[in-house]
């Protein structure tokens, strides 16, 4: 027993299974016609996302129809009060041992910080690395302070595990700790004070789930979650860099990029570039990671000449540079042997768990318009006019554009324009800036209409009601137009992603954690990089068609200053095919990413592969198993690309998730990609829908800011095409296809904008 006088803190050991059941489900296989009843008395028919099963289990869930007529699965119902089994400790933990581990971890971390200060290496202004880092975190934006406690905890966890000689598997199940109040404030995400009846979402996403212990779920600053346990090589934070079969180093991410992803022009037969661009815009609404920094300075992992990596004491503990072969077909021309790569910032754990690293998401996990409005009060306020509920904008040519940035740090020095929005990546590429401009205009259009309908509403009411409507518009388009286009209508129905138009629902579950998966952020939702074209074909109505290489419009949205460019570019995005999703990626991304006026840039494919290893995502085969597919045991099973894979991977079990997912043949029901990515993406957005109390269709039993039946019927009329037509500078004479993501064709002909009627805002009169 501990002496009664020892009051520093109390350590309560509770070994828990690796993932809470609200976070994990397993893949299922479905027959085409689900039955309406479950045969077992211990099962009930629920939506798939509501069913809790073990992540490592190979379970086949029987399909059925829910009481609402939706496709569900027969799921075992746990008996009330039944507790999950807890494994006993194979050792006894003394307070002294734990204190020693904390002390040793603190000493190691302190030495690391002192070493960093002594060997401080920062990026040089204008270098490719600086531009690449702007891709992850442009300076000067209120993203929230990085928490050094999260990194110290990694060294504490390693010290603790080493002292107990724990295996890697045991380290993934490190105990939860109940600490004294002072340590809890230091190591845990703070609880939020919530009003369960608040009509509007919080800007930072907190209190969506008003249960005190869950009030941070999905909020900005909450970590990414996982479908499967991480593959950290030390069970704590060491990235996945060795073969799980041979133990030898995995091939360089750049070598894999060169071998597997050439630049081949294969245009998609159905979808246009607007699908690609809307996907990136929406991804910024629910994912925002940033690399580790030294205070406000960037971390450099390569030497000044990029001829090699920094070594020994000169290397930051978060460095993970990408090696470049001396025989590289492109970088060898410039003597480049090292691409800078810094690991992602970590978050504190909401449960004070002393365990493996969890990556930080700086924006809300919800689809809530945070890319338009921001994820914190300071940023949101800076974007408002505080008059009539409108957002700030600029009119340099008489046409409404985003407000200009206060500094040019996030753009090329020679850019004539640099904008700001709710997300600081707004200037990454001009087509992304176009999407931000569209939804800025939509906000101000709706706010102006509401002000005319409800003259008694003040600025705050107009702003919040408009934000609520625009968030609903984004959800409606995302779930009913975008997701069916990428995962297929069958998969969208299977996971309950499609909405019942004009009807209130009550699907919210406080037990579904609305958190973005590492697997989505680090791999699956990066599928769109394969669909990027190397150039925009901009069809101007009043001048000659223009072919613009994408590297000319990275961090340079100046073309928006041209009169009528906004309208012309939207027409062009709807008309130009996206690239086919396959084993090809444009050199604009794999050689010239953010090159500026340099002859070379970085390689996004390499960054994606390295990011997956930083996240410690498990190999592709593990996710095939999770999705109900057979593991691939030979490279021949990958098809024609198998020989190229075999040239850079030792074993099929080594193939990275992003690589394998891109190469998987599309499903038969119209998805862009194969079953693995389709399952991950569908599972993800089912969680974000059914775990969102404020989802736009949820009625008064669930959502204190619910829409009336009349308002939902108007929202059901909204389409991306109608939003585009409502916000053009010259809608007369402009035609758009009703399905804005599909190329114009005889089955999807362009129709005059006057026929694309959206919602009638008079449904909001007096409400």
From Swiss-Prot:
Gene3D superfamilies: Haem peroxidase domain superfamily, animal type. The modification N-acetylcysteine is found at residue 188. GO terms for molecular function: heme binding; lactoperoxidase activity; metal ion binding; peroxidase activity. Heme b binds at residue 529. GO terms for cellular component: extracellular region. Its EC number is 1.11.1.7. It comes from the Eukaryota. Its main location: secreted. Its cofactor is heme b. Residues 28-187 form a propeptide. InterPro entries: Haem_peroxidase_animal, Haem_peroxidase_sf, Haem_peroxidase_sf_animal. The active site is at residue 284. It is found in: Secreted. The modification 3',4'-dihydroxyphenylalanine is found at residue 331. It holds the Pfam family An_peroxidase. The record marks 425 as: Transition state stabilizer. Disulfide bonds join 194-207, 411-418, 725-753. Residues 1-27 form the signal peptide. N-glycosylated on Trp by mannose. Glycans are attached at residues 165, 237, 457, 658, 764. Heterodimer. Involved in the formation of a rigid and insoluble egg chorion by catalyzing chorion protein cross-linking through dityrosine formation and phenol oxidase-catalyzed chorion melanization. This is Chorion peroxidase. The lineage of its organism: Eukaryota, Metazoa, Ecdysozoa, Arthropoda, Hexapoda.
